[in-house]
Amino acid sequence: MKLEPYLVPFDLSNAKVAFESRIVERGNWKLVMENNRECYHCATSHPELTRTFPESTLHSGAGGDAERADLEQLVEACEAMGLPGRFWISDDNQCRVMRMRLLADARSMTITGKPAVTGKTLGKVPAEPNVGDVLLYHFPSTWNHFTADHALSFRVLPVSPTETELVSKWLVPKGAVEGVDYDLKVLTEVWLATNEQDSKLVAQNQQGIASPAYEPGPYAPQQEHGVIQFIDWYCATITKRLEGAGKLEVVA
């Protein structure tokens, strides 16, 4: 399956970058990705984000029966409007895309849940009814969110063994005017706060694994389902890169 059907309705070629943030997290790239894929910390660490984004493992293909049934209603309604959203993951776990319902009928990941951009939507996506949030992950370096009013793109890039650059971009309809159609603080405040909170968690994790007392433990099958998928992809990819006696000799 290709990603194009999921993204075409948003017409990102006619969107513009309203804001860009760059921070360097004090942790290894792999820790940054694992932190992003793990669900345990959200309730206590992300008060802004969890106003609208559900603490659910549906985004990795897990979740309970009631959650799945509720999500199926949203997906079917969107498909009837020509907006794909059914969960799909590549065979090697590298890429995943799906649509999710935001909490309390929220339209956007803002403090209030109301659209950050008013009067305009991305591409052909309708403002009503609620179409939720399309999530796109692609290892090793990006996760993305697409709501009717704006899109978010995140990219991680290793800087050193203990430093990782995170670049975040907020995209809005090309015709949207700052101060008229959207307020920059309203647009960015949730994820600016979330990025800062995650950065602190990553730094703490980096300190923890550097301790001589550190021992890795098992992952929780439900709440860390996304981490397991990432680790499975990581291990399989590293193994392929190291296949062959010659390559292993070079590494040695």
Predicted ranges, named:
Residues 1-252:
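C-terminal catalytic domain of Rieske-type non-heme iron oxygenases
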